[in-house]
């Protein structure tokens, strides 16, 4: 047992230590940039290697009209989404709570519970006064001392 144990490294010998891991910043989607990328890719696809400048100019004019058509389609889609959200015909009036409090589906009779609470408070108040009838007088005497 006099043998010394060889300490093995935690990392394998042939493994590389990773450099700093950079976190990617989260960005919101920017659809304008996406539209620009799409139009550029369409230009590249529709732009064959032509020798004449007239054909190139005609292709550029076509891509402008196509982008106008795409913009019109996007506008129509956005307006359709707005119309779907504003549709009030689907609201079921039986689900609306008229009492003004959230009950998570449970119907509560607030008048009944208020009466029950008042009754329980009266019982506890009467029990406290019966237990110590002179206690209320002592409190009034203490108040008189502080009023001076």
Curated annotation (Swiss-Prot):
InterPro entries xrefs: Histone_chaperone_domain_CHZ
Biased composition (Basic and acidic residues): 70-79, 106-124
Keyword tags: Chaperone, Nucleus
Gene Ontology cellular component list: extracellular region; nucleus
Compositional bias ranges of the Acidic residues kind: 80-90, 136-148
Sequence ranges of Low complexity compositional bias: 49-62, 125-135
Chaperone listed as a keyword: yes
Compartments where found: Nucleus
Single GO biological process annotation from the record: chromatin remodeling
GO molecular function annotations of the record: histone binding
Family named by the database record: Belongs to the CHZ1 family.
Function according to Swiss-Prot or TrEMBL: Forms a chaperone-bound H2A.Z-H2B complex that acts as a source for SWR1 complex-dependent H2A to H2A.Z histone replacement in chromatin.
Name by which UniProt lists this protein: Histone H2A.Z-specific chaperone CHZ1
Organism annotation: Candida glabrata (strain ATCC 2001 / BCRC 20586 / JCM 3761 / NBRC 0622 / NRRL Y-65 / CBS 138) (Yeast)
Recorded name of the encoding gene: CHZ1
């Amino acid at each position: 047992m006099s043998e010394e144990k060889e300490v093995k490294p935690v990392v394998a010998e042939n493994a590389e230590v990773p450099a700093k891991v950079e976190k990617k910043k989260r960005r919101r989607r920017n659809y304008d940039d996406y539209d620009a990328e799409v139009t550029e890719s369409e230009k590249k696809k529709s732009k064959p290697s032509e020798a004449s400048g007239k054909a190139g100019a005609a292709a550029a004019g076509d891509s402008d009209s196509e982008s106008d058509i795409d913009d019109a389609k996007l506008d129509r889609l956005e307006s359709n989404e707005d119309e779907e959200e504003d549709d009030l015909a689907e609201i079921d009036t039986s689900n609306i709570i008229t009492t003004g409090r959230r009950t998570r589906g449970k119907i509560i009779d607030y008048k009944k519970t208020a009466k029950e609470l008042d009754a329980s408070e009266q019982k506890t108040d009467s029990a406290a006064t019966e237990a110590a009838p002179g206690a209320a007088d002592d409190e009034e005497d203490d108040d008189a001392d502080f009023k001076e």
